[in-house]
From Swiss-Prot:
It comes from Shewanella denitrificans (strain OS217 / ATCC BAA-1090 / DSM 15013). It catalyses: 4-imidazolone-5-propanoate + H2O = N-formimidoyl-L-glutamate. GO terms for cellular component: cytoplasm. N-formimidoyl-L-glutamate binds at Y145, N326, G328. The gene is hutI. This is Imidazolonepropionase. Its main location: cytoplasm.
Length: 414
């Protein structure tokens, strides 16, 4: 056999359901890589003969290998700070009250409009490095802090540029319908003005995004303080006509039926979903839409309404765990902490949490045929951890357990 590298003396949490073991585990295992893909994996005793002198061999010393982690929901490119709003919330102001008073997303919009691409790139690079140090190999980055054509394009350009200069793969999402900008707010004609902004998103922003090939998907914030069902459907229809995947912020603060609409239109995921009901869960199950859990926002906003975890299990909806890294509701740049929070706050099992940041996260980004679990033919994105069981990744936080990271067959962290 001719391989580019071989890993021995490892235990592998493949996260491959076909293995039939918790975590898709193969103990006392080995794995071979060729041309950036996994060429062989299985018990060490069954490893075929290969040219030891011509092949780099890495010894895992009995440690665990997992797929590279995938953060499927971030707002990583932004400028400014909202620490003052943190203080206001601790004094009793709600997220909705701050947003309606012109804070929240709108304050970050102002900072992003004023920042240039170089500043945004450097801020994004620092945050991406922080995630990469925790074993993240793929990240989704949304726009949504521009709310005008120029700034939305600027944010997406920076996200694309980060992907060109970093080993972490970047999937970009156009979130022009994140909030209604101040220039379109009119209390006397709120629906009419927000409809006019949706016109801008659909007729001008999206074509400009497509002209520069800046987005892989389109997202909308469907809530009482943002966009209604009819407006969401308009954006989704335009996105699908443009050939883009769709996903939705839904049921975070209330339930207006966004998840059912997203499911009907074939969305990859619905995200937040604290107020999701059984009808919505059933719709997700029938459409194969993923449920993205964002424990960082739940924690930071001190929410009390839990996502319907038992219903999601009952209907076998793929559960994803993501950081939602953003300046207002989840300024926590740690994917590993999200694994712990998903277990402690939402009562996921450690296996469910890890699946939520690997195999299910890949599904939520539409890349499950290439990454997210370890099997022959899959891209060789994986991490070696100094742990005695895969459950330790969700159990304990704060100690650096990452030993190695391999990205597309190349050792990028050692």
């Amino acid at each position: 056999m001719s391989w580019d590298q071989v890993w021995i003396d490892i235990n592998i949490a493949t996260m491959d359901a076909n293995i039939g073991e918790p975590y898709g585990a193969i103990t006392q295992a080995a794995m071979a890589v060729k041309d950036g893909k996994i060429a062989w994996l299985g018990p060490r005793s069954e490893l075929p003969e290969f040219d030891v002198l011509a092949t780099p061999v890495y010894r895992g010393k009995g440690n665990w290998v997992t797929p590279g982690l995938i953060d499927a929901h971030t707002h990583l490119v932004f400028a400014g700070s909202r620490a003052n709003e943190f203080e206001l919330r601790l004094k009793g102001a709600s997220y909705e009250e701050i947003a309606r008073a012109g804070g929240g997303i709108i304050s970050t919009v102002k900072a992003c409009r004023e920042a240039d691409e170089a500043e945004l790139f450097e801020l994004g690079r620092q945050r991406l490095n922080a995630l990469a140090k925790e074993g993240v190999t793929t990240v989704e980055i949304k726009s949504g802090y521009g709310l005008d054509i120029e700034t939305e394009l600027k944010l997406l350009r920076v996200a694309r540029e980060l992907g060109k200069h970093h080993h972490v793969d970047i999937k970009t999402t156009f979130l022009g319908a994140h909030a209604i900008p101040s220039e379109y707010k009119d209390a006397a004609n709120s629906t009419e003005r927000s409809d006019a902004y949706v016109d801008l998103v659909v007729n001008e922003m999206l074509p400009a995004v497509m002209a520069e090939n800046l987005a892989d998907a389109v997202d909308v914030f469907c809530e009482g303080i943002a966009f209604n069902l009819a407006q969401t459907k308009r954006v989704f229809t335009a996105a699908k006509q443009a050939g883009l995947d769709i996903k939705l912020h839904a049921e975070q603060l209330s339930n207006i039926g966004g998840s059912q609409l997203a499911a009907q239109m074939g969305a990859l995921s619905v995200d937040h979903i604290e107020y999701l009901d059984e009808a919505g869960v059933k719709a997700l199950s029938e459409s194969g839409t993923c449920a993205v859990l964002l424990p960082g926002a739940f924690y930071f906003l001190r929410e009390t309404k839990l996502p319907p975890i038992d219903l999601l299990r009952q209907y076998k909806v793929p559960m994803v765990v993501a950081s939602d890294y953003n300046p207002g509701s989840s300024p926590i740049c740690s994917s590993l902490l999200m694994l712990n929070m998903a277990c402690t706050l939402f009562r996921l099992t450690p296996e469910e949490a890890l699946a939520g940041m690997t195999v299910n996260a890949a599904k939520a980004l539409g890349i499950g045929d290439n990454v997210g679990h370890l099997a022959v033919g899959m891209q060789a994105d994986f991490c070696l951890w100094n742990i005695s069981s895969a459950a330790e990744l969700a159990y304990s936080y704060g100690v650096d357990r990452l030993i190695d990271v391999v990205k597309t067959g190349k050792l990028v962290h050692q």
